[in-house]
Amino acid sequence: MSSEYYTTIGMDVSDRTTKVCVMSKEGRAPRVVMETTIPTTKEGLAKFLSTQDAATPVAFETGTHCRWMNEVAQGMGFKVYVANPCRLRMVTDSKAKNDKNDARMIARLALADPGLLHPVRLRGAEYQRMINLHEMRGLLVKQRSGIIVQLRAVAKSMGFRIAKVSAAGFHNLDRAAWPKELRDIAWPMLKNLEQLAVTIKTYDKLIRELAGTPAFKAQVDRLMEIHCVGILVATAFVAVTGGDMDRFERPRDVGPWSGLAPKQDQSGDVDRQCHVTKAGSPLLRRLLVESAQLIMRDCSSDTDLKAKGLRICARGGKIARRKAVTAVARSLAVLMTAMLKKPDAPYVPLSERCEKELLAMRAMV
């Protein structure tokens, strides 16, 4: 399918400057009309676009600056294509790769057929805010875990063991519970952990408040009907998908989209077994796996998802448990998508067939 445009603007965005290529095919083969460099700022972009016809589409790749650039260009009446760089091999794998050539190639692809850019849909501001809150919270949780692991390692190296306690309550350990040799080392870090705990709770509060807004509330409440799906998983799923389930023709399409489906490498009689692609959002994938691990626990409620995981574990093998968790995480994403696609359909956590299957597996133990 050819493009309906006769002129396009391609941009290769760097942190400080942006290479711009205006390309036209009117009356002849594609040719470069103008090339320039502009500052990567709102003012610089607006100043350049003010000299161009608003009927000319603008194309650039996803990246740190793509959101505000999209807002500025659309606010001035331009059609914007935000290209997916993971699908642009002729740009990323070019033998003569530089900013100038990248801008030219993006403009040429938009001129030939905008579909070749594999344009992505950017999330709304409220969804991006939720993702930002999750990422900041995740960073703090990772810091807290690292400090706790290091303190336990130091204690072991000195012949001591720290009492088992949750990460959230680790800083509440009484000073007297620490050996004398460790108190001076551990106490400053415990103060740091206490401050981290306060900050994490602040982010939890902000996430809950945003989850109560109209953009999130209905879908988050629906997803939290699922066993072992809390507010963090539900809000992350809605935010990363942008609340738009129409992007998935079938619920199972969310598996490859979230990076939880195995890569396919089949040719003739050869069908290689590959790892999951890990495409998409690492944040969502991590939270789905954490929920899957909770579902697989012995103390968790019996559900169809748990039955599926135990069925895979029963096959045996060195990594059966890991395969089961990944499969449950993928099935959980499919279930969440299906429930949002049909918000009025009743949720049945455990079917009669899976209930009998679980009873049979336990009888064999």
What do these predicted ranges mean?
Residues 1-365:
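A detector of single, family-specific signature residues
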